């Protein structure tokens, strides 16, 4: 029979860890939030501060499915800013482990960023960008003072900011790279989301082998036919090795997703067979891999 003390301890252990992301518009809040999302955090954008304790409570009831929550708080919710300190006090009383991350940047850097995207500052009204920046600094002054971590992004690019977030929150967790290996047919067009494209039309086409034509590259006989062609296995070995090199570089640069497109004429035989083999090689190297055969059923 469980005691009340044991039950309370179990409930306390289930309370999610919380990170509140705030800071200057244009300083990188979205990038910081995306980094935490890629590390497995449950991220909520522009949640009114008064609802943060409710979000934490819902996470505590998720039976461990939501162990880490990140909430982005910015000037779009300025009407609710007065509730933030009250919410933080509530969280502290509950024993919630929470951190405030504040993204900072110089006026010059922020002006350049707003001008580069040709967007107004959310607080500038009829004034200039610098007027909006000044108003926002004043609005966020107390929150910045309460921050557990202030990151100045004035001279940082996206990859450098991600590296700083990883250093703070990844712990021993290696940044994951998720790869999609997609077979396709050139006759149906290139995949618009492909990062890398490779062409299998240098191999003989099983379409012209009557007993293989009805099947796809998932068929063992078709796959063997493709892989036993001159140059096929050498290509597989060399390209798989190249992909491992590229994957290591993507991890260093903070890239989390890559789509490798493998094409042939119709996307039914050669590209399908080679995609399966390449995906298996990537998975064996620890890359989380998904295989998609975009055009396999179109003929």
UniProtKB/Swiss-Prot annotation:
Signal peptide coordinates = none
Q: Which GO terms describe its molecular function?
A: ATP binding; GTP binding; molecular adaptor activity
Print the keywords alphabetically. ATP-binding, GTP-binding, Nucleotide-binding
Q: Which residues bind GTP?
A: 74-77
Show the Gene3D superfamilies listed in the entry. Answer: P-loop containing nucleotide triphosphate hydrolases (3.40.50.300)
List ligand-binding residues for ATP. Answer: 23-30
Please name the InterPro entries in this protein's record: P-loop_NTPase, RapZ-like, RapZ-like_N, RapZ_C
Q: Which domain of life is it from?
A: Bacteria
Q: What does this protein do?
A: Displays ATPase and GTPase activities.
Q: Which HAMAP family match?
A: RapZ_like
Protein family membership: Belongs to the RapZ-like family.
> Know the name of this protein?
Nucleotide-binding protein SCO1952
